Amino acid sequence: MKTISKYVSVLLVAALCFTACDDWMNAGPEGATKTADQKSDAASQNPEAAAADISAIYAQFIQLYAGLGDLGYSRHNDFGYAAICMFTEAQGMDFVSPNIGYNWFGFSDWTAVRDNTLTTTSGLISHLLWNEYYKIIRACNTITEGVDRENPGTQLHALCQALAVRAFCYLQLAQLYQFTYSEATLQKPCVPIVREGMTAEQQEANPRATVEEVFKMIKEDLDFACAGLDGFVRADKGYVNQAVAFGLRARANLVMKNWAAAAEDADKALQLSGATPLSIEECGKPGFADNTAHNVIWANIIVETNDIVQTGIINWVSHMSSFYNDGYTSVAATRWISSGLYEEIAATDVRKGWWLDENLESPLLDAPGLSNMKEAIQSQEMPYQNVKFGTGDNSSSGMGAAAGDWILMRAEELILIKAEGLAKSGGDGAGVLANFVQTYRDPSYTVAQHGLGIEDEIWWQRRVELWGEGFAWGDIMRLEKDVDRSNSNNWPKAWASQGVKAGRNILLWRIPQSEIEANKGINEADNNPFEAL
């Protein structure tokens, strides 16, 4: 609480002090841009340069004010990719937040979030998402511009990482700005492609590429990365390796309805990574904040010296973990599961303990050694509040507690991709699903217990297993599901009735005003239409 008060008083100073740093290899004489040949020469003369550029890519994921800082705004929900995950989760039906002033992620109001202007608080969110992804893409292009793909030499692994991360960004963007990949959408406008080889004039007048064009590049980049990262040993889980590349391609294949390929890639990623799911016992305590856990394949590694941690409150732990007593969750801006989904979870499923019940109880709070965490949450408990996410340091309530890693890929997700891919390609997806849940979550589980077909059962498992981790919106779009909040009693009244049928234009995010003004290839007529709820 004291940190929140402190930051309100220094927010304007922080905004004035914010600067964006471009990598040295992008700067040429008199501020000009170096050519690809010049960058390649620089990299060969200074091998540390490519490593620095790679680090810059991953740093962009966790940069303070990355989305809005260049536009002159300093928002407490602008702390990198984890913030995007929270925004998109709030658009669905399972991730509930209170409708209060301290809730920086209360964007469950459909009409507000579809605002793309710079003159409203809600309109800033469209800019935040867009800018964050394209800044990461720009950092990736710093590598791809300077390396010959046909003859990358010692820069092969750097190139492959850049291509994989770029593909990740475009895959995320594609699921925000157009309906899912299908024969009906292939020629529909998606997002502008920014990549190596483009002239300044092409970038300044860059129209929306089609869905087909965007996914063609995603697939080409991931194919190259999957092959080129063979044998690469990364320094830590913050870097993309071959396992991550196969996992990303599994995600892309799932969206593209390449079911068998998705299952195959997911299985390959699991084999390469050696990652295994958390056990029932391990799931029985708060977590999902430590990249060293054996189920984690890729993560944003966050340490105490990172700017987002030094703020105390402008980080995902402050907004998500119920156990951090000096962040926004300590003033009731907590995250809950929808009561309807919670009630569907069996009492024998360890994941039911990831949220408080209607009596404010969870077996996770009684886990050995967690008495301090139980005390931390008691002042602001709400029914169905999450206790899934721990902090960076479960023994601390200070700065170390805010340094939680953000998990980008874990074994459980890949198993669910494998199950879905097999189920939709004639394989034994049900067997894979049953084995996972019975072994690692609920020994009493049966695939038929929710009365759903196998495809919807896998989606149900994803909704529970991956709750809060940034997958919900992509699943709603690719599976063409309605957003239905009617079966829950804990949605704030203002948002509870905001159900949306699949296929409506209101599901599409709108290209931000600043992009339309800066990009000669896009005008307001090219934007996704605004649709009233």
What kind of feature is each model-predicted range?
Residues G31-D41, H76-I84, Y177-Q187, V191, ...:
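Short, surface-exposed recognition loops and adjoining beta-strand edges that mediate ligand/DNA contacts
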Residues I345-M409:
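Flexible, polar/acidic helix-loop-strand segments at domain edges
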Residues G101-Y177, A209-E212, C226-F232, M399-W406, ...:
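Conserved, well-structured interaction surfaces
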Residues C21-M86, G327, A332-R335, L341-A347, ...:
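Membrane-proximal, proline-rich intrinsically disordered regions
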Residues M1-T19:
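Sec-dependent bacterial lipoprotein signal peptides
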